[in-house]
From Swiss-Prot:
Keywords: Cell inner membrane, Cell membrane, Membrane, NAD, Quinone, Translocase, Transport, Ubiquinone. It catalyses: a quinone + NADH + 5 H(+)(in) = a quinol + NAD(+) + 4 H(+)(out). NDH-1 shuttles electrons from NADH, via FMN and iron-sulfur (Fe-S) centers, to quinones in the respiratory chain. The immediate electron acceptor for the enzyme in this species is believed to be ubiquinone. Couples the redox reaction to proton translocation (for every two electrons transferred, four hydrogen ions are translocated across the cytoplasmic membrane), and thus conserves the redox energy in a proton gradient. It comes from the Bacteria. It is found in: Cell inner membrane. This is NADH-quinone oxidoreductase subunit C. The gene is nuoC. Belongs to the complex I 30 kDa subunit family.
Amino acid sequence: MASKIETLKANLEAALGARAVSLVEAVGELTLVVKASDYLEVAKQLRDDRSLGFEQLIDLCGIDYQTYGDGAYDGPRFAAVLHLLSVANNWRLRVRVFAPDDDLPIVPSVVDIWNSANWYEREAFDLYGIVFEGHPDLRRILTDYGFIGHPFRKDFPVSGYVEMRYDPEEKRVVYQPVTIEPREITPRVIREDRYGGLKH
């Protein structure tokens, strides 16, 4: 008898065919990678196909792969990652779609398929700059209206570009260039023989 994850994998392979760029099992979970051009069609099938039945999107986030792993990442830089749940079949799936353009990352919005994607897509847009084409209200959700850049991108400076403070003379909040001096972080050396006060 096949396990749930084997059954799901077989169902996905049968339903999606060549539209599944990759389908990998790791740590008891399946990750499906699809092209941005197939993303909406695949998402609808994941929801509507009874052999799959992913009626609920439980999470969506952005990822910046600029420096992934041990060095520079070779593939596309930005991806949107969805976590789907099938209550009827009691299984989960991770779906990853890469934006084809690193300079202006655009992927289709899945708000019309799973309305719970609304604020998740806004968050990924705000923090990573991933544009979700077709989103009904794509604007910042966590950062300030005048915020410059996208703070979760790996090339965004840790201290940011501007800082905000209250100016008592102007009696309002003002923006000014960052006054924090850059500092070099020296890694702490851990001596295994004396770590945590323990003697070996």
